[in-house]
Amino acid sequence: PVGTMKRILISHVNVFNADSRYSSIISGIPGALIENVTLSDIHIYHQGGYTEADGLLTPPEQEKVYPEPWMFGTIPAKGFYIRHARNITLDNVNYHYEKADGRPLFVTDDASDIRYRNITVDGKEFNTAN
């Protein structure tokens, strides 16, 4: 049987020289959602350098193997890829890119109740309404 991941709080994290292939991933599996996660007060320094075409990729489902970021290939989001999840909050998350990255900041798939608050990209406020 599949376990659950819920009621998670991660805060006050700094990430440097992040491999932009994988960005950040919150991914459950079909029928087993990750729920009630809050990520706050985070700074992520990415390498960047990916294209708009990379943003069109759909990572494979890999529910039979241990979850490692490489198993999905290049992720279609430059910030967070959120799949099979519910009630996720990103608050005061700040992204910095060494090189331009053409992918969207956030990509969601089978995800609901996702909240973005106080998000910046290279020091500029990110409009989450779009």
Where are the predicted features?
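Extracellular/periplasmic carbohydrate-active domains that bind, remodel
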Residues: P1-N130
